[in-house]
Every structure is written in structure tokens, then in C-alpha cells.
């Protein structure tokens, strides 16, 4: 149960997967889970060296074949960190993740692929966030407090 032993959540995307990871960071932050989105491969590698076996990394890749991300995740795993991967099945990244959430959108058109893939990935992130919120009642209270406190920021 990675969400129960987690002390920090690091999201590691590259390129077109970055907005998806930023959305995930926002969702988990609102659930009172310390999270960061690290989209630079060099910083991913350096961050990997500061993680421990209580941390969780979510690797996000729409190809699953990016060498820099695969190398960062190999380093992360060498420190005993649990890695959850969101990527297509049967890719180098899917083969090294502890938990693979394979997302195969089955499309070839370059014009529609980014949109369809992004929607599929964001739906999975939403499901994960709801699942975590259900496991952590205190997260639900925190989310309610955040939403309520934002009312003062709105124009009347």
C-alpha cells in the first residue's frame, strides 16, 4: 500500500507528460500529501539520490521509452523507492515499475494522440486521487478546508 507508507510523492514526467503531472501534484497537495513535480531529467536524477524507501515516485510517460526517464527511475529504484508508472504497456518503463498502470490508447494519428492520451492519463490520475481520499479521511477534511478558505479569494 504505497499511499499509507509514503512520506513524499515525487511525480517524474518529461515533455508532453508534464501538464498531467502538474495536475496530479495539485490534486495530491489538496489531499495533504507532500508532492513535487520534477520535469528536468538532471534534477530527477539528483532527486532520486535523496529519496528513501518511505517515498513514492509516480513516473508518467506517454511513450514509456524515454531514456532519461528510464535511467532516473532505475536510480530511484536502487534506493528502495516504490515506483508507480503511468505509461503504455510493454515498454522499458513499464518493465521496471513496481506498479504499472498501463495506458494503451490504441491510436496512431499524430493529431489526436496527444489529446486522447492526455484525457486517459488525467482520468487515471483522478481515479488515484479519489482512491487516496477515500483511504485518508483526514485528507477529505483538509480538502474541504482548502475549498472553504478559497471563498475569501473570490470577487463578490
For each predicted feature, which ranges?
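Glycine-rich phosphate-binding loops that contact phosphosugars or nucleotide phosphates
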Residues: 2-123, 127-136
Amino acid at each position: 500500500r504505497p499511499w499509507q507508507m509514503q512520506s513524499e510523492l515525487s511525480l517524474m514526467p518529461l515533455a508532453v507528460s508534464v501538464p498531467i503531472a502538474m495536475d496530479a501534484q495539485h490534486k495530491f497537495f489538496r489531499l495533504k500529501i507532500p508532492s513535487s513535480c520534477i520535469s528536468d531529467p538532471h534534477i530527477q536524477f539528483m532527486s532520486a539520490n535523496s529519496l528513501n524507501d518511505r517515498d513514492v515516485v509516480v513516473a508518467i510517460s506517454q511513450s514509456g521509452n524515454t531514456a532519461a526517464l528510464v535511467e532516473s527511475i532505475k536510480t530511484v529504484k536502487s534506493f528502495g523507492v516504490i515506483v508507480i508508472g503511468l505509461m503504455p504497456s510493454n515498454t522499458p518503463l513499464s518493465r521496471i515499475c513496481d506498479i504499472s498502470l498501463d495506458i494503451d490508447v490504441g491510436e496512431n494519428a499524430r493529431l489526436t494522440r496527444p489529446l486522447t492520451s492526455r484525457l486517459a492519463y488525467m482520468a487515471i490520475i483522478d481515479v488515484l486521487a479519489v482512491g487516496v481520499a477515500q483511504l485518508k479521511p483526514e485528507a477529505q477534511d483538509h480538502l474541504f478546508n482548502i475549498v472553504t478558505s478559497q471563498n475569501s479569494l473570490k470577487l463578490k
